[in-house]
Amino acid sequence: MIITVGGLPGTGTTTTSKLLSEKYGLNHVCAGFIFRDMAKEMNMTLQEFSSYAETNTEVDNEIDRRQVEAAQSGDLILEGRLAGWILKRSDIKPDLSIWLKADPMVRCIRISERENENVDLALEKMISREASEKKRYKEIYNIEIDDLSIYDLTIESSKWDAKGVFNIIEKAIDNLKA
């Protein structure tokens, strides 16, 4: 089974992906972790690496390559803002493609708690990062990140806690057509 989980920062994609991975015994591959690892390898902050990635397409190409390679082996949770799009463009059909969304201030508060920084700083970083990513996705892939047409399931994650979001997805998985 291949499941993609996408969403903007602070929507709960990592928490949800980990819960799904544990429940269904699937490998969890996260584009964000790949991106963070690459930033560390180049001794850059996430903001610096995001700016670098805007003009260096090899960053996105490497992330894409690793995602496709993982999906070709099957049986995984593929987490990333473009995970669903990358598989679609590689003619790999996930069993379920999910997009999580949440109110921007809810996301900002979640990020500030996760990163242990004040809300104003988290908001500033979040806005900068999302603008950078949106620009990159449009220029490199001609993808509008706001286009949710490829997703089977879209969940407003600020309405439920992590377990509630997981329960909705679990019901969807349990009711997939064979």
Curated annotation (Swiss-Prot):
Designated gene of the protein: cmk
TM spans (from-to): none
GO cellular component terms listed in the entry, alphabetical order: cytoplasm
EC number: 2.7.4.25
Family to which the UniProt record says this protein belongs: Belongs to the cytidylate kinase family. Type 2 subfamily.
Amino-acid positions noted as binding ATP in the UniProt annotation, renumbered to this chain: G7, L8, P9, G10, T11, G12, T13, T14, T15
Stored InterPro entries: Cyt_kin_arch, Cytidylate_kinase_dom, P-loop_NTPase
Catalytic activity annotation: CMP + ATP = CDP + ADP; dCMP + ATP = dCDP + ADP
SUPFAM superfamilies linked to this entry: P-loop containing nucleoside triphosphate hydrolases
Keywords in alphabetical order: ATP-binding, Cytoplasm, Kinase, Nucleotide-binding, Transferase
Enzyme's top EC category: transferase
Location in or out of the cell: Cytoplasm
Gene Ontology molecular function terms on file: ATP binding; CMP kinase activity; dCMP kinase activity
Name of the protein in its database record: Cytidylate kinase
UniProt GO BP: pyrimidine nucleotide metabolic process
